[in-house]
Regions:
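Short, solvent-exposed loop/beta-turn-alpha elements that line the ligand-binding surface or hinge
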Residues: 1-3, 10-20, 57-71, 133-137, ...
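Extracytoplasmic
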Residues: 4-6, 47, 84, 211
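Pocket-flanking alpha-helical
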Residues: 9-10, 17, 35-40, 128-163, ...
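Append "and occasionally in soluble cytosolic enzymes with long acidic Gly/Pro-rich linkers
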Residues: 18-111, 115, 176, 202, ...
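Short, solvent-exposed turn/loop segments enriched in Gly/Ser/Thr/Pro and often Arg
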Residues: 43-46, 146-148, 217-223
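Ligand/substrate-recognition segments at binding pockets and active sites
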Residues: 78-150, 172, 193, 221
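Short amphipathic alpha-helical coiled-coil/interface segments
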Residues: 184, 188, 193-208
């Protein structure tokens, strides 16, 4: 089942030309997400349409996966006067819960960008140094992700994309949007679940419009079990509940 995790590509919105949402949307069109699913995850993840995993109660079912259209991407960049663009993509070197092979992912993105005339230079970064290096703001793009043991949508949005998260060094996009922050605060203060859900859906629409980060994948939670076991429930956090588990009766095969 879908897990409470997300892998994404962050644009450094503090650096031109990535401070322009139109540029970010154009670059997003160049990424072949279906190939990422086949070459990186091998069926153990689903393409992400939102920064909020599908397992969340506030997930926007109207969220759309960014289409793959390199011809349109090239045309948009040309219309914006951007040709022969070179970008630095900073990538963690080690496997992560939301991305088993970040470097291979970066190479696939590099190849996709080359198809639209954008040169991507891959900059491998050791995990423990990644946050500090990204806060220097020298990167253009970075691959990252997030997993949480909380089902509260705020645990995804606020630590990663709020204005305050820039100072706490977890907002790798360096994106600060007061409208987005206000919506998060409205959701946090609301006492009604329906109102919170509406606010978080609005937050997802803002992210889809501004695109400071491009959601890539949400890893599935997998559990191996016997063929005759019934009623096993796996939570989005990876925990298994055996409360309703039973074994299906099968005829015993008598040995001769």
């Amino acid at each position: 089942r879908p897990g409470m995790n997300i892998a994404w590509l962050a644009f450094n919105t503090a650096k031109p030309p990535l401070d322009n949402p139109e540029v970010r949307h154009a670059l997003a069109l160049a990424i072949n997400n279906q190939r990422l699913m086949q070459s990186i995850y091998y069926g153990t993840a689903e393409t992400a349409a939102s920064m909020l995993p599908r397992a969340s109660w506030a997930y926007d079912n109207d969220a759309k996966i960014t289409e793959y259209n390199p011809q349109e991407a090239r045309a948009r960049l040309k219309a914006l006067g951007l040709e022969n663009l070179t970008l630095k993509l900073w990538v963690p070197t080690s496997s992560q819960a939301w991305n088993p092979s970040p470097l291979k992912t970066a190479e696939l993105i590099q190849a996709d960008m080359a198809q639209i005339g954008v040169k991507v230079i891959i900059m491998p970064v050791e995990g423990r140094f990644q946050e500090a290096r990204l806060m220097d703001m020298n990167h253009d793009l970075t691959l990252s992700g997030w997993a949480t043991d909380s089902n509260d949508p705020d645990s995804f949005f606020r630590p990663l994309l709020s204005c305050a998260a820039i100072a706490s060094q977890t907002n790798f996009a360096h994106w600060c949007n007061r409208e987005f922050d206000d919506v998060l605060q409205k959701a946090l203060l609301s006492q009604q679940l329906s109102s919170r859900m509406d606010a978080y859906k609005e937050a997802q629409r803002i992210l889809a419009r501004e695109l400071p980060v491009l959601p890539l994948a949400s890893s599935l939670r997998l559990q191996a079990y016997r063929y005759d076991m019934k009623g096993l429930v796996l939570s989005p956090f990876g925990n298994a509940s055996f409360a309703g588990v039973s074994r299906e009766k099968t005829e015993e095969v008598k040995k001769p």
